[in-house]
Regions:
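Polar, enzyme-active/binding microenvironments
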Residues: 1-310
Length: 310
């Protein structure tokens, strides 16, 4: 077994970045303090205006992966979470994909899937600036899947194959060992563009949408990360939303809402939260700096479940 130690420097800060409000993509990075309620504050800017840039963190550094800037862009950039400021170039992704999912441990960041529809898994060593490397493949190509992790296992759920119905399959990988994903269980939702977050034992997936209507949903479900099996209903978000993100500590998940349906006709500035250990509906947390969407998976924190010890 492996022992994990909580780092008192981890304050519960969540960061999220990029997004779209007609007619522009944005570079804004926002931050919140997850243990308290309140509105998001300005942190700095990404190196590009972007949407759909997945985020990973080792507790000190947050890295955003390849993104959409009007076309696919393989840029990755990073910030130091305790220090406000603009992002710095980290390296390049293996491809110019967007609408990817991501999760991380205390050392390694994982990005998977993407648009154009892809089955690629790639990884970075978060503490070391450089380009992403091939990790393996997910079971089938998909975009707009959501991810979360414990210190050892990464979980991905949902997504859309490009044409046809959304996926209900949940898959997992062992973060420290390169290789392909394996089947974990089934989602209750079968949604794309969900948000995912976790503590060290319980994973939360929420929201999302289905084709062809692109009408958001408000469902929250959970999995026990160490035990393969199907997701279980947890409760409901305060609003139907998709293409949004989630940030967590060991006790709480905050959702920063994105788009509401049908067909992306509304952009939200709201945030809500749940207590991970207690099933139930979400409660209002505060507001984003302004209303925008199309930033699936772009949130992470200095205290998420992939860091262990919570």
């Amino acid at each position: 077994w492996r022992q994990f130690t909580y780092n008192q420097g981890q304050s519960g800060r969540g960061v999220f970045a990029g997004g779209f409000s007609n007619p522009l993509y944005h570079s804004i990075i926002s931050y919140i303090q997850i243990p308290t309620t309140g509105n998001a504050l300005n942190f700095g800017d990404l190196t590009t205006n972007a949407g759909f840039a997945p985020a990973v963190s080792n507790g000190v550094r947050a890295v955003w992966g390849s993104r959409y800037t009007g076309s696919g862009n393989n840029t990755m950039d990073y910030v130091t979470i305790p220090s406000q400021g603009n992002a710095i170039d980290f390296g390049n992704s293996t491809g110019s994909l967007w609408s990817r999912g991501g999760f991380s441990s205390s050392t390694r960041g994982i990005f998977f899937g993407g648009n154009p529809t892809s089955n690629v898994i790639e990884y970075i060593e978060i503490a070391t600036i450089g380009d992403a490397l091939d990790f393996g493949d997910i079971m089938s190509s998909r975009r707009d899947a959501a991810g979360l992790a414990s210190a050892t296992r990464g979980i991905l759920s949902g997504g859309q194959p490009g044409i046809g119905a959304n996926y209900t399959r949940i898959e997992s990988i062992t973060i420290a060992s390169k290789g392909n994903s394996i089947r974990f269980g089934e989602s209750t939702m079968g949604s794309m563009a969900m948000a995912g977050a976790s503590n060290s034992t319980r994973g939360i997936f929420a929201g999302g949408t289905t084709v062809p209507t692109l009408d958001g949903n408000n469902t929250i479900e959970f999995v026990t990360i160490s035990s393969e099996g199907n997701a279980v209903d947890f409760g409901d978000l305060t609003q139907k939303t998709y293409r949004f993100n989630a940030m967590s500590t060991g006790t709480r998940v905050v959702f920063a809402h994105g788009t509401t349906g049908p067909s992306g006709t509304g952009l939200l500035n709201t945030m809500d939260y749940i207590n991970i250990s207690s099933q139930g509906n979400a409660t209002d947390f505060g507001d984003k700096i302004f209303a925008y969407g199309e930033y699936s998976g772009s949130g992470t924190s200095d205290s998420h479940g992939g860091l262990g010890g919570f």
